[in-house]
């Protein structure tokens, strides 16, 4: 869990500094999360630099105006406080902007992947919510208009 939080911190720092690449220590879980990030289009990719020390280089992704796609990365379930969702709740759960990573008996999956898998099963399977990623998709001009509208 500490390695994942270190990776999240390195990604956040890299995004704030507008870096194109950050280097972190890897593990099996780190590779799972990074491949999921890559599949969802949140990073450009990652590459193993050194196999002996498990050094991984993460290539960050930005929009054309150099704003990041990620607005916040949060580790939800920690050792003492774990958050679980039942399978029936997962089928009715449709977040708009956030991306949820859920640990189930199928491994670490995003919410849409797990919902798709649950459609094929007779009894839906739930899991533990591990991470919540807030995606920065709102256009800044639209955001300003919404603020002005709320002020009136």
UniProtKB/Swiss-Prot annotation:
It comes from the Eukaryota. It holds the Pfam family Ribosomal_S8. GO terms for molecular function: structural constituent of ribosome. Keywords: Mitochondrion, Ribonucleoprotein, Ribosomal protein. It is found in: Mitochondrion. Its main location: mitochondrion. One of its GO terms (biological process) is translation. One of its GO terms (cellular component) is mitochondrion. Belongs to the universal ribosomal protein uS8 family. This is Small ribosomal subunit protein uS8m. It comes from Dictyostelium citrinum (Slime mold).
